[in-house]
Amino acid sequence: MEQYIKTISLQNQNLIIDYLNENILPHMIINPKGSAKGRRQLWIQTAPPLNSTAQWHVGYEDERIMNYVRSIAPEGFTPEAVLVTKGGNIKRHRDARYADYQGMSINLGKVTWYYERSNDQYFWQPNLYESVPAARYDLTGGEVFMFNTKNPHWVENAHPERWGINVWQISKNTRDEYEQFMQDRANGNLTEEQLDYKVAGY
């Protein structure tokens, strides 16, 4: 991790988890494929494309979650896509093209998080080592931190009741696509497929 933001109190963790179990869990899908196969998850607000042929989708609308992540995000970081997960691991990966270098993670439960800090800056640097020794973080719940989404990272030993809230702002490489999507969304010009928030990812 690059920057530790805060620790959420146990009381507030329980309030958040109760809300997620009641309001988010019924809408979640089980990821059928990819590096997080079998994990429960739900995109909030916007579901970005994970490859060059995929479309932008709307996410599930939950303003309470969006307001919360905005309230704890550091200055200069704008939450634009949020993925809520429950249980499940994810294999070593870098986040896709849509993701800006800086991302935020909110951990609510026991999990082991691995991170290879090959790039210590939030921008592209040439001639970096492709792989460096991974740092291991045994998280217990309440941790909020920033990390470089383009550095390899993964999750193991996730407790079945562990929740994660992962937050991105959109990269400059896909900013024009995102703004066009948001304009089409505001004007009611999205396809039926794009209006389906139950899409997989990772």
List PLM regions with ranges.
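Extracellular structured ligand-interaction cores
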Residues: G76-T78, Y101-G103, R162-G164
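A short glycine-rich, His/Asp/Glu-containing loop-to-beta-strand
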Residues: S71-K86
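Nucleic-acid-interacting cores, centered on viral/eukaryotic replication and modification enzymes
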Residues: M1, G88, K172
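Short acidic (Asp/Glu) patches
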Residues: I65-N67, V84-R94
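Beta-strand elements of modular eukaryotic interaction domains
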Residues: H93-A96, M104, A135-R136, E156
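Non-heme Fe(II)/2-oxoglutarate
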Residues: M1-A73
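Short, conserved beta-strand element in jelly-roll/cupin
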Residues: L83-K86, A96-W113
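Catalytic core of Fe(II)/2-oxoglutarate
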Residues: S118-Y202
